[in-house]
Amino acid sequence: MPIKIKDDLPAAEILNSENIFIMPENVAFHQDIRPLKIAILNLMPIKITTEVQLLRLIGNTALQIEIELLHLKTHVCKNTSEEYLTNFYRTFDEIKNEKFDGLIITGAPIEQLEFSRVNYWEELKDIMEWSKCHVYSTLHICWGAQAGLYYHYGIPKYILKEKLFGVFKHEVTEEKEKLVRGFDDEFYVPHSRYTEVKREDVEKVKELTILAQSKKAGVYLILDNKGRRIFVTGHSEYDPLTLKDEYMRDISKGEDIKMPENYFPDDNPDRKPVVKWRSHADLLFSNWLNYYVYQETPYDLSEMPPSFL
């Protein structure tokens, strides 16, 4: 089934070219189906890139989904025009009285800052608090996962000695959980971050379960005991060349950055990377949307129970 987005959203052209099923608003309006309402709080600088990456995965499921793109009012975006945000995004104030089946909080390239020094931290805290009563299941990605773990459970992040950068092997640690249903025994995920959360800190919180981890990249997938909050420390949504683009960007700035691990064939940046994470990414998002959103959310969203009960 398709995703429903604004008819003139630029990401739609890219998704259509990849044969991702996009439904125009006027067609979706005439279908007697309640689509899942999914909000995406896009904290990344270049909005359209993240839109395409996430909508590609969401659009590959068998569900009709209505997307609401959100941006923060308290942060001035330097890489996306105000006109673009006005046309395709809404603010928290505009949607705070609505309820959603799901919410995605993306990463942001600010992980070396203390949370309190992030200029939009107060607004983000308001959104995470609001999500307890207005969102059935929230998927937090990379820095968004670290922010969520810190806000909801007081779990800190730690600065790494060097950037964790590359594509790393992971293993499932809780095979019976629905979120990892169908996962291979070993699977790969891209990571690009300067900070981490530690396993021992997560294990101290009885409401949380670690579902997957990596010897090199550490804790990867964390689930709360009600399935209402999911934390993903990597970037399974990344495009084939995202890590290359980040690497070349940092090299051009003169930064002392190592080549992404397990990414370029023979560690040759002139060779095309082999994608090892696409199937896992599709399965992660489809499992979340099916088992933790579609199967659990009441048909009438006004009947949604708060996550703290």
UniProtKB/Swiss-Prot annotation:
Highest taxon in the source lineage: Bacteria
Transferase keyword on record: yes
InterPro entries (alphabetical): Class_I_gatase-like, HST_MetA, MetA_family
Coiled coil start-end: none
GO molecular function, one term: homoserine O-succinyltransferase activity
Site (Important for substrate specificity): S192
Enzyme class per UniProt: transferase
Cellular-component GO terms for this entry: cytoplasm
Protein's UniProt keywords contain Amino-acid biosynthesis: yes
Catalytic activity annotation: L-homoserine + acetyl-CoA = O-acetyl-L-homoserine + CoA
Primary location class: cytoplasm
Protein name stated in the entry: Homoserine O-acetyltransferase
